[in-house]
Amino acid sequence: MTDLTTLEADVLAQVAAAGDLAALDAVRVSALGKTGRVSGLLKTLGAMSPDERKERGAAINVLRDRVQTALNDKKAALETAALDARLASETLDLTLPAPRRRKGSVHPTMQTMDEMVAIFAEMGFAVAEGPDIEDDFHNFTALNFPPKHPAREMHDTFFFNPAKNEDGSDGERMLLRTHTSPVQVRTMLSQKPPIRIIAPGRTYRCDNDATHTPVFHQVEGLVIDKAIHMGHLKWTLETFLARFFETDAVKTQFRPHHFPFTEPSAETDVQCDRSGGEIKVGQGTSWLEILGCGMVHPNVLRACGIDPDEYQGFAFGMGVDRLGMLKYGMPDLRDMWSSDGRWLAHYGFSAFAAPNAASGLS
């Protein structure tokens, strides 16, 4: 067994002398690899008698276990030393100031919508919501749109391909809502008057220029009750606009217009100053259209199961993005969705500045 003792001493000396993991692995291969010095001893057992093979084999296994244990211990020691060296080279100076991280901000559109909701909530309106994907009835038919109305065409509305029925025929064609008016329809179908709601949310149309985007945001309002008239509508809008622009100097004018879902219908303008490349609401001699409104058409009331001889109502709709542009001086609507961090840093709002009518909107 003298040869085994000598071999063990030699291999363990090589293990102890290994200065890194690569050198240690070379020792492992030379000793325990397929052609290694310890592994080679096992090949000599076949020429021995059973008794010799038993005694010699046990001794070789003991040698192999000792070498493997030494290798494992040395590997752990080398890894610990390497980690200690790395940590020593990566020490942190805790007296240095922490790196500044850029703060996120609330998008102007979301801030504007929150401001609008806060004002209408103070005026007694509840918030109603509905799906972005709508059917023809809720988006058009119930709102008194004629069958051949241009809004029903592909150039103005985003339609989905119709699903197939079991017989292979085309099913109903769904669409992305072109306004939040379907929320009004769903509310009238599910609730009895009196109704006083606003419907904020995303809407979609095939439009893209400096003042229009394919995806935009609206806040629509609906009031249904007995003896409702245009005077109630006018007071509601003028009160809202004065609160939103935070000035009592806001002047409005109502121009006759046509909407399928209201009769009479009007567009509302605010007086403004366009000089100096900036629009200032509440001063000047110019007028700017900002919303549409009117008395709910009797056909819409009937489609929703409400008797127009007993109940009347008014509705209005305004673009959140455009109102935000006017209030905060943003020149191009498309910049809102350009994902430009510099623009958002300039026009964004603190997440802790949630608007409410009591403490101020902005």
UniProtKB/Swiss-Prot annotation:
GO terms for molecular function: ATP binding; magnesium ion binding; phenylalanine-tRNA ligase activity; tRNA binding. Gene3D superfamilies: Bira Bifunctional Protein, Domain 2. Mg(2+) binds at residue 263. Its cofactor is Mg(2+). Tetramer of two alpha and two beta subunits. PANTHER family: PHENYLALANINE--TRNA LIGASE, MITOCHONDRIAL, PHENYLALANYL-TRNA SYNTHETASE. Belongs to the class-II aminoacyl-tRNA synthetase family. Phe-tRNA synthetase alpha subunit type 1 subfamily. One of its GO terms (cellular component) is cytoplasm. The keyword Repeat does not apply. Pfam families: Phe_tRNA-synt_N (PF02912), tRNA-synt_2d (PF01409). HAMAP family: Phe_tRNA_synth_alpha1 (MF_00281). Its EC number is 6.1.1.20. Binds 2 magnesium ions per tetramer. It is found in: Cytoplasm. The gene is pheS. Its main location: cytoplasm. This is Phenylalanine--tRNA ligase alpha subunit. GO terms for biological process: phenylalanyl-tRNA aminoacylation.
